[in-house]
Amino acid sequence: MRTRSLLLMAVVALGLAALAAWALVQRGGSAPASTGEALPGFADRIETLERVEVRGAGDGLLVSLMRRGDGWEVEQYPGWPANQREISRALFRLGEARRIEAKTDKPALHARLGVEDVGQAEAKGTELRFEGGGDTLRLVVGRNHPGLGGSYVRVADEDASWLIDADLSPARDPVAWLDRRLVDLPLARTERVRIQPASGRAFSLVRSGEGFVVQGAPAGRSLDAQTTATAALPEQLALDGLAPDDGQEASRRHVYETVDGLRLEVASWQDEAGTWARLSLALDEDVATAWFKQAGEDAEPEAERLQRLRAQVAGWQGRFEGRRFLLPPHKAANLLASRAEHLAPD
């Protein structure tokens, strides 16, 4: 009886072992158990990197970053600064990322995690490619884990895939890697907005106390929310896209005049992509000097303030020259508002 019991236990043990082996295969095979850096050797290479690429399906180049001196430039938009801070953070985040769980090492199952070879026409993931300081490093980034967070990744040319402790998800649009700051003209400095709409007569918004009113409109008729929104357009204005200036004729113009002599012109038009604008900035030094005289004797010397304004104008104008800018819809909507839309009904 004892012999039969031992034999039965042995059979059960063998069966359980076989079942466990089968389950392991179903999970993707015997993935390696070692953990460590998400992309081995990357952290030591960050300072020597010369080029970063984001590639997608069909091995298509989506974004390319080139090191220029101490910073980065988006190759698709030469001459416009990249978002240096965010790029540095992204590189540091990848350098700090660690593998936390081994996943499948079966190429046939890579697509389930989005880490299949991006050379495939239907690939869903992206490949980060790093050049400079040694051999090219390549990391395929797939989906994010729905519960734990973190991305599924695979070092290109290796079969093993991993869940890491960081959400990489590289942006596929080159614009997302740009310094999107276009201009920042504080509302507190603006005293007048001259508007030539697409149709109808020209009108102006002028400062009245803490807000703005439509010049010449009956008292109390101006809609404070709309007049303020239009006057505040250049405050922290960002871009949604940019392109070489193709000479397209503008359908409306807004000229923003500040208390210290700045004159910002926003000439805008629309197409299927949205609202585009051509910007130009000038300085009326007589107005600036007159304003400085009101500042009091403890203020910064006039000559220094004027020189600072000149430098600000030159810097902005240099960025605007030869380019047109796609504006965010919530900002662009204020360029489309007519005179009537700045006024309450009779």
Language-model segment annotations:
Residues 1-346:
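A short-motif feature that recognizes glycine-rich, charge-decorated loops
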